[in-house]
């Protein structure tokens, strides 16, 4: 059995780890341009699409094209669909938060981590609106480090340095685990910052044996022990 990690803080990616694209918003936006999808395939499409990218989001056209392909959108409709998703992801235009569907156990797991006395910081490559968007999803009061706000993005270690500062005095990289769903941004970035990464991989798509994996956030407790 893998030894548990003695830690004082847990960093979490946002998109793909605690929130996903809302399946009904995605299906509705595509339906408005005459493209039908299976809404229940949205989460699976995300995890398949994000494997090769450092950042997922409506503002990342390469990710969105792969996401749409995984949803079965025909190639000849792709560019139109990319525009539809980009518009949906712009809260100022759409009036909704695209990344607002909670992953299973997200709220309960974060609550249990905090009850155990561990600090929690959300570390996300985003557009400057992550904190307000996540607050609307039920995460008000959880510290958020947004790449656009701090001026560095995963895998740059500086974004993790900002998160360490936010976590509080005395928190060192060795005291922290970071949970993320991308190899390039989350796993490599955490390692570069001296932080132990845990790969959030619900579909078991990653076969690498050089880092830890969880399929659900509730599984984190198999890897962690709270340090006083």
Regions found by a protein language model. Name each.
Residues 1-17, 73, 107, 111-114, ...:
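Asp-based, Mg2+/Mn2+-dependent phosphohydrolase catalytic module
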Residues 2-118, 128-132:
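N-terminal helical cap/lid subdomain that shapes the substrate entry/recognition surface
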């Amino acid at each position: 059995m893998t030894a548990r990690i003695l830690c004082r803080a847990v960093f979490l990616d946002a998109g793909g780890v605690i929130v996903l694209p809302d399946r009904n918003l995605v299906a509705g936006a595509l339906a408005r341009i005459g493209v039908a999808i299976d809404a229940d395939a949205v989460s699976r499409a995300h995890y398949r699409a994000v494997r090769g990218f450092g950042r997922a989001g409506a503002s990342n056209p390469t990710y969105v094209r792969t996401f749409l392909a995984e949803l079965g959108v025909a190639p000849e409709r792709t560019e139109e669909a990319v525009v539809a998703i980009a518009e949906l992801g712009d809260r100022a235009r759409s009036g909704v938060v695209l990344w607002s569907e909670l992953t299973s156990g997200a709220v309960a797991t974060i609550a249990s981590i905090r009850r155990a006395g561990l600090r929690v910081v959300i570390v996300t490559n985003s557009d400057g609106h992550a904190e307000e968007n996540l607050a609307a999803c039920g995460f008000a009061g959880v510290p958020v480090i947004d790449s656009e706000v701090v001026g560095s993005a995963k895998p740059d270690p500086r974004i993790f340095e900002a998160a360490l500062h936010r976590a509080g005095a005395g928190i060192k990289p060795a005291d922290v685990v970071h949970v993320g769903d991308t190899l390039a941004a989350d796993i490599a970035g955490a390692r570069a910052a001296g932080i132990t990464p845990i790969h959030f991989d619900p579909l078991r798509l990653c076969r690498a044996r050089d880092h830890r994996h969880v399929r659900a956030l509730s599984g984190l407790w198999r890897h962690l022990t709270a340090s006083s």
